[in-house]
């Protein structure tokens, strides 16, 4: 397939995954939560007297478990809760930015310009951590929180813009071009023109303009959302039928889909490799400096430098659109993006596709619960177990490695069990089993409230739970997309995958805020795991109500009804 080296445009696109995912895996996921907590602790005092200054990473018995509070913006806040509040605000701002920037990211003229603007703004937010004063001041936690919010928002919006290049890059592939030529030679140009041409006025795929009006994210983002293990998992389901292309048009569409999936999966793998590699290398300076706040700031700053440095090939190699139709910015474009949300959650839609929206309801809770568990566990390890920064980094590495291993092994085990069992092991069953397994983590942690032993009281337990969570988290993401893909009306994949991505981002600010508030009120972040237990257990019966077979039929009926309504309007 083509040459051994990827084309220049693809190499430039891969370079951005290599650059940005380091900031995500290192700064956003590991170092920023710890840094915010430690910066607040440096200006904090032990409750309830609020006279003795707090100590960082002191595992002595007279300090471990004591509540540290810092006065921030005139309010005394638990230092662990402060980090959770900042995370909640950051996720909310991230969701707002993703929705608002969507229409512009779908315009070729703005796509690269926005990508570079957000990339260098985000990298700068990380580099600025190197300029903080060595001594703590009352304003340093606030400034760190602002930079955290900026980093979260710019990273997410830059990924939206980056993924918007994906379909165009797939269409440049040699095999896709050959399939296009074969299709056009059979006189199928009219039917394929909207699929192949990369314009800003036309939607990709077979989605109508009416459907395009309901998109929440750029059309070019959606194939990337679908491609990461989703299509392969959906097709590997023993109950799903693989339809071979019967003509040149289907061959072209199939080749385009496979190429999109290959590029997306390769980009994801490159991003993971760079993230884990740099995270491992950063263990050296963090360990050498004793896990101090300066070592955390240094790691964040180096992540920002990496992001900026390896974005240069992206800046040079990615194509930039020339001024043209739609290149003029208008506030109405942002307004339209928000109007689209209301159309997607209209009662009529919910009534016609009940199983799809029941699944989305469960997904909102589960997605928030999983992501908050990751963040809360890091803060728990730092503030309650007093684990050093190098040890927490090791926890993060264990989670990511376990997630990759399980993402590879679980589909193979599923296929093996399906061939040896009388009843097939469907994607839905695997997802349900994964959710039940994930609920074990808050159950075990909450057991520490009533039992004198266990209940996540030691570092060894944290390492074991990190591996357990990683083994569950990887398949959870893949199989959630796979099950959802089975419930989507044929021909309307982009519309409903955008809703899936939106619900993932928009609701994930609730968990961090709730856990932070509980920790603030009780003085013990362990009580926050009671909330996480609810977030992971309550959706289980909701998810159990999803009837995938019936949902497939509803999706087909919805698509047929939509086509009929469009035909009637044309007449």
From Swiss-Prot:
**Looking at the UniProt record for this protein, which Gene Ontology cellular component terms does it annotate, in alphabetical order?**
vacuolar membrane
Membrane topology designation: Multi-pass membrane protein
The entry's localization annotation reads: Vacuole membrane
A Gene Ontology biological process term: autophagy
Q: Where is this region: Disordered?
A: 185-210
Keywords in UniProt for this one? Amino-acid transport, Autophagy, Membrane, Transmembrane, Transmembrane helix, Transport, Vacuole
Which InterPro entries does the record cross-reference, listed alphabetically? Atg22, Atg22-like, ATG22/LtaA_families, MFS_trans_sf
- Where do transmembrane segments lie in this chain? 16-36, 89-109, 127-147, 149-169, 269-289, 298-318, 358-378, 390-410, 430-450, 463-483, 498-518, 528-548
Name the coiled-coil region(s): none
- For the keyword Transport, the answer is yes
> Which Pfam families does the protein's record reference?
ATG22
Identify the domain of life.
Answer: Eukaryota
| Stated role | Vacuolar effluxer which mediate the efflux of amino acids resulting from autophagic degradation. The release of autophagic amino acids allows the maintenance of protein synthesis and viability during nitrogen starvation.
Question: What family is this protein classified in?
Answer: Belongs to the ATG22 family.
- Protein name as it appears in the record: Autophagy-related protein 22
Originating organism: Cryptococcus neoformans var. neoformans serotype D (strain JEC21 / ATCC MYA-565) (Filobasidiella neoformans)
């Amino acid at each position: 397939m083509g040459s051994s080296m990827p084309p220049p445009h693809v190499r430039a696109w891969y370079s951005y995954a290599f650059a940005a995912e380091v900031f995500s895996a290192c700064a956003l996921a590991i170092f920023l939560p710890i840094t915010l907590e430690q910066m607040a602790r440096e200006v904090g005092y032990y409750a309830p007297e609020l006279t003795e200054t707090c100590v960082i990473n002191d595992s002595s018995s007279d300090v471990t478990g004591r509540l540290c509070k810092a006065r921030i913006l005139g309010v005394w806040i638990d230092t662990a809760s402060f980090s959770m509040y900042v995370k909640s605000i950051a996720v909310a701002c991230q969701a707002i930015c993703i929705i608002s920037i969507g229409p512009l990211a779908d315009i070729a003229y703005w796509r690269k310009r926005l990508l570079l603007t957000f990339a260098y703004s985000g990298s700068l937010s990380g580099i600025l951590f190197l300029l903080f004063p060595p001594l703590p001041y009352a304003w340093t936690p606030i400034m760190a929180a602002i930079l955290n919010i900026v980093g979260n928002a710019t990273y997410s919006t830059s990924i939206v813009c980056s993924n918007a290049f994906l379909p165009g890059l797939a269409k440049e592939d040699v095999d896709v071009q050959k399939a296009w030529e074969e299709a056009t030679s059979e006189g199928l140009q009219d039917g394929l023109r909207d699929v192949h041409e990369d314009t800003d006025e036309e939607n990709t795929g077979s989605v109508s303009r009416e459907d395009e009006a309901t998109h929440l994210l750029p059309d070019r983002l959606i194939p990337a959302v679908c491609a990461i293990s989703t299509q392969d998992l959906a097709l590997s389901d023993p109950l799903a039928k693989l339809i071979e292309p019967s003509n040149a048009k289907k061959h072209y569409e199939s080749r385009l889909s496979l190429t999109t999936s290959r590029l997306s999966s390769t980009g994801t793998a490159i991003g993971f490799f760079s993230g884990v590699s740099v995270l491992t290398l950063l263990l050296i300076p963090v360990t050498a400096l004793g896990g101090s706040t300066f070592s955390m700031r240094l790691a964040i700053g180096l992540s920002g430098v990496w992001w900026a440095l390896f974005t240069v090939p992206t800046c040079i190699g990615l194509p930039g659109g020339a001024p043209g139709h739609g290149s003029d910015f208008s506030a109405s474009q942002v307004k339209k993006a928000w109007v689209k949300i209301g159309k997607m959650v209209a009662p009529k839609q919910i009534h016609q596709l009940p199983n799809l929206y029941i699944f989305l309801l469960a997904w909102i809770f589960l997605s928030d619960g999983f992501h908050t568990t990751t963040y809360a566990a890091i803060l728990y390890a730092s503030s309650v177990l007093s684990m050093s920064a190098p040890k927490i980094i090791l926890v993060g590495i264990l989670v990511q490695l376990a997630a990759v291993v399980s993402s590879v092994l679980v589909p193979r085990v599923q296929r093996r069990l399906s061939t040896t069992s009388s009843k097939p092991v469907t994607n839905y069953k695997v997802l349900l089993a994964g959710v039940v397994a994930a609920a074990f983590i808050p159950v075990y942690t909450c057991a520490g409230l009533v039992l004198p032993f266990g209940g996540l009281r030691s570092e060894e337990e944290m390492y074991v739970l990190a591996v357990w969570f990683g083994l569950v988290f990887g398949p959870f993401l893949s199989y959630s997309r796979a099950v959802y893909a089975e419930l989507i009306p044929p021909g309307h994949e982009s519309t409903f995958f955008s809703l899936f991505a939106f619900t993932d981002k928009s609701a994930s600010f609730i968990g961090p805020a709730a856990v932070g508030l509980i920790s603030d009120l009780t003085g013990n972040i362990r009580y926050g795991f009671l909330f996480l237990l609810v977030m992971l257990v309550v959706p289980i019966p909701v998810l159990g109500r999803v009837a995938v077979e019936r949902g497939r039929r509803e999706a087909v009926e919805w698509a047929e009804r939509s086509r009929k309504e469009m035909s009637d309007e044309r007449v």
